[in-house]
Amino acid sequence: GLAACGVPVLHAIGLNDKIVPNAENSFPLINNYIKAGGMATVMPMTKGPQNLEGHHFPIERPSVIADFISSNAYPVKSILDPAQFHVARTRLTNSFIQFTKEKTGRVAFMGGSITENPGWRNKVTQYLQERFPETKFEFIDAGISSTGSTPGAFRLASEVLAKGKIDLFFEEAAVNDRTNGFNNQAQVRGMEGIVRHMRISNPLVDIVVMHCVDPEKIAEYTAGKIPNEIINHELVASHYNVNTVNWSKEVTARIAAAEFSWKEDFRDLHPSKFGQEVYARSLINYLSNAYGNISLEALPSSHVLPAPIDKFSYFEGNYVDVKNATILSKWSIDEKWVPKDGVGGRKQYMNRPALVAAEAGAEMELTFSGKAIGICIASGPDAGVIEYSIDGKPFKKKDLFTQWSRVIHLPWYIVLEEELKNKQHRIRIRMSADKNEKSKGNACRILYFLVNG
């Protein structure tokens, strides 16, 4: 809103106004504006006749108001058009028809903390409700902190598709795909997994992918380079004719044009209120253009589903319950796992069943069908090292400790093998006596098995 954008307010009031009482209107407005970070000044008008029960009064010292306008006005200059940072490969005709003719709409948002946290997402839902006032919407917030495209590909079925047919889908993963160290192949397989699975579930679904900004992306764009994760996500978007909104490039360009600064205004990859306004304004601009001039006589049309870019992409990704495992020794099911060491975790991954081991030699196995197998774990201060074998082949090792494990039981998605034959397999997992030098133990807490197939 205005406060987030730093717009100052000068409010002239009559102290005896009975038509619009200050206690019910002006005073709450000013207090809330200041709480929201805005600058507000009040000028009580006490001289001269107070007419219409104090609602009409003469303006005192108009020079003060003129000075306020002069000191806070910016020179008129053009700002960058958000549309130049949008790749509109297709219109959002199908969701438009659904919203206008069927009067119902299910809209899902998937991403990391930038999606989960309140801000741009709330403003976009408000825009859709105002744009289609007769439509009954269901909005799904499937944003979870620390998750990018690979987690998203395995989360999609249970956290989004299980809610019903999706009409409009928003996805962002560029920040976490970099932060969490997924390589180029994994970024393509993850994003294609999400987009293709979504289109298989509903060929009519309209999809928008957003590229969020971080300091590293600003540095690369400034140096004339395109960040790898954006290249990879655009590869998928282009292949599936999906629209994209490049917030990362847009913020970089606006900073270069001196519209605002990173340090004072946008502040962080988790945007300030001002930054949330930048994101919302851009995406709403895109939606306004995408929904413009669509005929009410238009008919829905299935999006073309091309051959996959990579046959091993995670478009059949899903969770498998940890209770499907066969315990051989020293593992157990904690029905409502929560951290017990005083270190926090993500709420979406607590108070649910976890397959837990805490000492070397613990062993279990799982039979599954598919092309890929992995685990979603809570990686905390005592995260250990696992050894795993598929179909009796030699054991491999995987360190479960992350750079964040000392301070949080982080939900961590690990794809152990991803180019298997699409048939039944058996994986055996055991705890190694080895551990990361920074870890306090030999623990593994599996929240879900990940299967692609």
Regions found by a protein language model. Give the residues of each.
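Glycan-recognition and processing domains
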Residues: 292-367, 376
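Membrane/wall-proximal cationic-aromatic binding patches
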Residues: 77-109, 114, 128
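Residues that mark the start of a beta-strand
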Residues: 8, 104-107, 138, 372, ...
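C-terminal catalytic histidine-bearing segment of alpha/beta-hydrolase fold enzymes
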Residues: 24-30, 34-76
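Short hydrophobic segments within beta-strands
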Residues: 12, 108-111, 210, 375-378, ...
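Catalytic nucleophile-elbow at a beta strand-turn-alpha helix junction centered on a G-D-S/GDSL motif
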Residues: 104-119, 144-148, 372, 381
